[in-house]
Amino acid sequence: MHPRYEMPFHWHMEFELMLVLSGEFSLLIDGRSYLLHKGDAAIISAGAVHGGTPSDCVYECVVFDMNRFLGSGSVCQAKYNALFERGAQIEPYQPAGSVTCQLIDRLFEAMEKEPEGYEFVTIGLMWQLFGQILLQHSYTVSTSGNKRNDRSTAQMKAALERIRKNYASRITLED
């Protein structure tokens, strides 16, 4: 990415991986702030409102639909669904040098270089990444204390969607 490419606030129903190659990136996810430095990574859960600002930063991102990696009726699909249907959110910040960050780095490298069989390597690294997240319990499950934040996120999504749909129109506060 260009060193000054700002990431406007948005959301999507896919996961997103981000790896900072140089500089710093100030990332906001569902109202929580993270400052990423060279080598740090972020895992952005499906449906999370996120955006950020680079500071002399070059970073890579990939968006993916986890359901495409899950085989219908597989043991992994059952474990994944049991966790994420309860509203689990993965811990976004992955520090440089951590096992999860190393897996993300290898994932981007495989996609960039595309060696023979890279498709298998990429999918294998995705499975390892999610296995590591489960192993380390690097996630939280929504509780009643998080409901206020969930409402705030839903309101932000509604506002962003209205802006997106009516971008070319004049919008007033009365609207």
Model-derived regions: residue spans:
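Short, Lys/Arg-enriched, Trp-marked, Pro/Gly-tolerant hinge/linker segments that flank
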Residues: 88-96, 111-122, 130-175
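Generic protein-terminus/edge-of-domain signal
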Residues: 1-37, 54-56, 74-79, 88-91
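A hydrophobic/aromatic-rich effector-binding and dimerization subdomain
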Residues: 1, 49-112, 131-141
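Preference for bulky hydrophobic residues occupying beta-strand positions
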Residues: 19, 27, 42, 62-64
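Short, surface-exposed helix-loop/turn micro-motifs enriched in polar/charged residues
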Residues: 34, 51, 60, 117-121, ...
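Short beta-strand or tight-loop elements
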Residues: 13, 46-48, 173
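Conserved metal-binding segment of the jelly-roll/cupin
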Residues: 36-49
